């Protein structure tokens, strides 16, 4: 998962009994005018995901990244920004929501440093691309602000070596078409691999994490590099990251964290391994078994029902897509 698992678990435990049902009662965040042009795969899961982040709570949910990611995952079902509700579209098209005002920072801005949050900014660029959002001016503004943070060697100052953030910067820049900057940031990402082959939030750690390693693999695989030497180095790093994931798997079909099963990490690992050309059928079978009657994917802290935080990261791997293939339009 993207946020600290312990913190998310506490939040999720609090909201499970009221938050999910409230989101369903308050109304779906996707506009009613959505055209049924082609039936998506796993329609019940798509329906669950559409209602997971409602108009009523969307403004308070954008800062974590999960709402943005749920919209990214819906792009895999053919949803575009034009099919989102006005309240959700505003999160992509209103300056006061994106960057903020003199009274309140936007969701892409750190309230303490007043600078752009690099990982969330990358996710915004990626989401804007795959959702076909009509917000090119704001995308350009985000890229300009990100460029200031990117050093000559590709390091992203505000990320403080957080491989998750840097991976999303790569994906966002690549989505926006800034391939030269994306390649530079790839160089910095390669240097963040731990000795065990994994990547993590903190460069001072000695071990990798499942989800961060998986998003790093996808970021690295999303960018065509300019020469054979760079490509060889990237491929070597990816191979070590793949070996890390395979070694961390439990029972050859899922991952665990904090003493329990980790469906988010498993979902991410599926996408990372698939992006690297690995067979993920056993992992997909395990994740598919956690899909509940409401279409959502079950979380260990809320058994018997779908969880919006898990489903926000789990739909694409269930239908055989990754953040690399989605960006390529596949």
Where are these regions (language model features)?
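Short helix/strand-capping connector loops at secondary-structure junctions
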Residues: 1, 292-300
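Bacterial Sec-dependent N-terminal signal peptides
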Residues: 1-15
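Non-Sec secretion/translocation targeting segments of pathogen effectors
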Residues: 1-5, 24, 278
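C-terminal segment of classical bacterial N-terminal signal peptides
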Residues: 16-34
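Structural signature of transmembrane alpha-helix termini at the membrane-water interface
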Residues: 28-32, 150-157
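Extended, well-ordered alpha-helical scaffold segments
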Residues: 36-54, 80-108, 134-153, 178-192, ...
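An alpha-helical repeat/solenoid feature that recognizes helix-turn-helix modules
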Residues: 55-82, 105-136, 156-184, 195-237, ...
């Amino acid at each position: 998962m993207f946020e600290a698992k312990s913190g998310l678990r506490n939040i999720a435990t609090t909201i499970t009994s009221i938050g999910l049902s409230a989101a369903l009662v308050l109304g779906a965040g996707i506009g009613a005018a959505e055209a049924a042009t082609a039936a998506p795969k796993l329609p019940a899961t798509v329906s669950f995901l559409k209602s997971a982040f409602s108009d009523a709570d969307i403004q308070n949910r954008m800062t974590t990244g999960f709402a943005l990611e749920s919209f990214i995952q819906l792009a895999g079902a053919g949803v575009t920004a034009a099919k989102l509700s006005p309240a959700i579209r505003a999160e992509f098209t209103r300056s006061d929501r994106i960057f903020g005002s003199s009274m309140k920072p936007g969701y892409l801005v750190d309230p303490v440093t007043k600078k752009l949050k690099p990982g969330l900014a990358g996710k915004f660029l990626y989401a804007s691309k795959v959702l076909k959002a009509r917000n090119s001016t704001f995308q350009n503004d985000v890229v300009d602000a990100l460029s200031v943070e990117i050093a000559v060697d590709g390091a992203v100052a505000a990320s403080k070596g957080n491989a998750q953030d840097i991976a999303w910067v790569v994906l966002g820049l690549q989505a926006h078409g800034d391939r030269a900057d994306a390649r530079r940031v790839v160089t910095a990402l390669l240097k963040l691999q731990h000795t065990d082959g994994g990547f993590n939030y903190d460069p001072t750690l000695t071990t990798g994490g499942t989800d961060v390693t998986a998003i790093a693999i996808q970021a690295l695989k999303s960018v065509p590099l300019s020469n054979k030497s760079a490509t060889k180095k990237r491929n070597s790093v990816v191979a070590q990251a793949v070996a890390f994931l395979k070694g961390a798997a439990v029972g050859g079909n899922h991952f665990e964290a904090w003493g329990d099963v980790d469906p988010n990490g498993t979902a991410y690992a599926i996408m990372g391994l698939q992006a690297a050309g690995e067979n993920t059928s056993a992992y997909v079978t395990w994740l598919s078994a956690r899909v509940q009657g409401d279409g959502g994917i079950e979380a260990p802290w809320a058994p018997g029902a779908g969880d919006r935080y898990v489903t926000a990261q789990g739909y694409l791997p269930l239908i055989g897509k990754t953040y690399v293939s989605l960006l390529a339009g596949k």
